[in-house]
Amino acid sequence: MSGLLKDKNIVVMGVANERSIAWGITKSLYNAGANLIFTNRQERSQTKLKKLLDKHNIEALALVNCDVESDDSIVSAFAEIKEKVGTIHGLVHSLAFAKTEELQGEYADTSRDGFLLAQNISAYSLVAVTREARKLMTEGGSIVTQTYLGAERVIQNYNVMGVAKASLEASVKYLAEDVGKDQIRVNAISAGPIRTLAAKGVSGFNEKMSVIEEKAPLRRNVDQDQVGDATMFFLSDLARGITGEVVHVDSGYHIIGG
């Protein structure tokens, strides 16, 4: 896939560590020739990311602070990206958060604050980020976010995050309609369970991975590299006719009825 994204400037939001889905995406995009811009919420996170990039000999076009809970921070971040890079051609939204206590027990016990927090970071952030990113996508482009089967079905303990992901998937469709006139595509990857830092907070996560190995058509779990390659496809011109879609990268588990 070398050269598939040559000369494309792509913003990646959500790299926390080497286990992050966003890190798998980073590797795929870099190997395809993309110029990468990264956003992080805090200086400390940015320092960790610099070390990670250096370790893997990946050169970033820019590192920018961005707190997606703040509209001002988002506006400032994309103003900085415009100043440093100019035009961008793609954006990876790999951001989600819910309080650990909301990811166990019954969904009916979800707190108001916990519900709003999950929606704000996991779903509304895509709306706010798209609003600013489209201003820099003067040549068209592609936006890809990450979702999960819990948006479509009841997954035990996924609770408030499942509802947030459902909101995210609906937003993908509405945003695809809004920015399509600018030749910008918006799609989502629904990945199977992957051992990320965020996944540790979901009660019973290991059991979910075992079920995939037993019941999915391919009888195996997916990894961050497979999700990375699928995301790279959506960001490339190979997917130029696709928008508003949610594509499952889960070894086919989503087709199984029980």
Where are these regions (language model features)?
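Canonical Rossmann dinucleotide-binding motif of NAD(H)/NADP(H)-dependent dehydrogenases/reductases
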Residues: 2-38
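Catalytic loop of short-chain dehydrogenase/reductase
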Residues: 14-23, 27, 96-135, 139-181, ...
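Rossmann-fold cofactor-recognition segment
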Residues: 53-72
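A glycine/serine/threonine-rich, flexible loop-to-helix segment
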Residues: 50-52, 181, 191-217, 256-258
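Short, small/polar-rich loop/turn modules that mediate ligand/substrate recognition or access, typified
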Residues: 180, 185, 242-244
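Conserved SDR Rossmann-fold cofactor-binding beta-strand/turn motif
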Residues: 185-195, 235, 248-250
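Short C-terminal tail/terminal secondary-structure segment
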Residues: 232, 243-258
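A conserved structural motif in NAD(P)-dependent oxidoreductases
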Residues: 216-227, 238
